[in-house]
Amino acid sequence: RMILNDGNGTYGRVLKPETVAALSQNGLGALKTPGWTTSMPNLANSGDFFPGFSKSWAYTFQVNDTALPTGRPAGSLSWAGIANSFYWIDRQTGLGGMWNTQILPFLDVSSWPGYVNFETTVYQHLAR
């Protein structure tokens, strides 16, 4: 919520708005974040978040460079945790979402599609 609120937390300002803007911008220049090949298949599958869509890395989060089929606009922030916990922060719309599981391996066949469906449903509901 603090990132969505330009640095304001529940009990007051945590970061300056210009700091939030800076930490949300591409920090790698022309480098893009590709998919990955696992070295530990018991913990993580090989994969890519939204293959075919350009993604870069801010100082804090992955940034999708283009709009995604879920409805998430370009410039939104996201990342994930090893037990299939995914989140996104859409500063343009003022929306954030989180999908938490405790399932291994990472990017398992049910968690990732569940998350994508959740995010898509949120944006479809907002479009009504």
Predicted regions and their residues:
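Catalytic loop of the DD-peptidase/beta-lactamase superfamily, centered on the K-T-G motif
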Residues: 1-128
